[in-house]
Amino acid sequence: MDPLPSFPGRPAIFDLASSPALTDALIEKLLHSERLEDFLHQALPLLTSRILGERDGIHASLLLLRPRRPALAVSSGDPAKALHETPGRFPGGPGMTALREGSPVRVGDTRTDRRWPAHLAVAVDHGIHSLLALPLEFGDEGQCVLSFCTTRPRDFPPAVVDSAAAVLDRGASVLHLAVRLDRYRVLEQDLRTAMSTRTAIDLAVGILMAQDRSDQTGAFALLKRASHYRNLPVRDVAVEIVERFSQRSPSTHFDA
């Protein structure tokens, strides 16, 4: 007799836990994703099939929380979407509890469990009877929780929870890498925006210095006064000055 529970369509637990194919598949999807959200949408069904196998009645969601960034959530169906947990919605549900405690949380039967009444009532309304939440920590770069819900009660016995956590751990490094790459991408965009803004302001200051025969400090003060009187950002006023002078918008050139 197999000592570990299984269900139709689910690969052998030990095969899943020992296979490096999950990491390779996640990396492939990361390489072909322009945005972090695109990657998570592609990663979610892959993680679901590798962890729980191919069968009906499974819905999954992934919630990513990062410092100073809005929560990012993806889901595989309406029931999972309805159960999304964010700090402002269901802040005390099984997913948030898993993140807070740093360990998996499971609900055997949403109709009889009394831990999260509001959240589980929504689950019951959508025909969901079992829940499993698996947390992942990315240090100071964020944390995420992968949640599964099914239409059958008691669908996640302890051995399945343990094997699911082990398989998810295989892909954790790629998920962390995706979060880190997105942070660098946002930083690059912010730097480009800042440099573009600086270019427009510097050009406008130079034009004002030439026209008014003033020094840099005086020209910038004039630019700020115009910004204040017109209730516009300094950059917008600077762009208008440059366009009026050169008949072209200012541009910043970046080396590839």
Sequence positions of predicted segments:
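Short beta-strand-to-loop transition segments that serve as allosteric relay/switch motifs
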Residues: 144-155, 169
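Helix-loop-beta substructure at the N-terminus of cytosolic sensory domains
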Residues: 2, 14-73, 84, 92, ...
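Signal-transducing alpha-helical linker
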Residues: 14, 18-22, 31, 35, ...
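Regulatory sensory and allosteric helical modules in signal-transduction proteins
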Residues: 71-73, 79-117, 121-124, 129
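Allosteric cytosolic regulatory segments
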Residues: 3-9, 24, 161-172
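Short hydrophobic beta-strand micro-motif common in sensory/regulatory domains
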Residues: 130-137
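Signal-transducing coiled-coil/dimerization helices and immediately adjacent hinge/linker segments
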Residues: 180-256
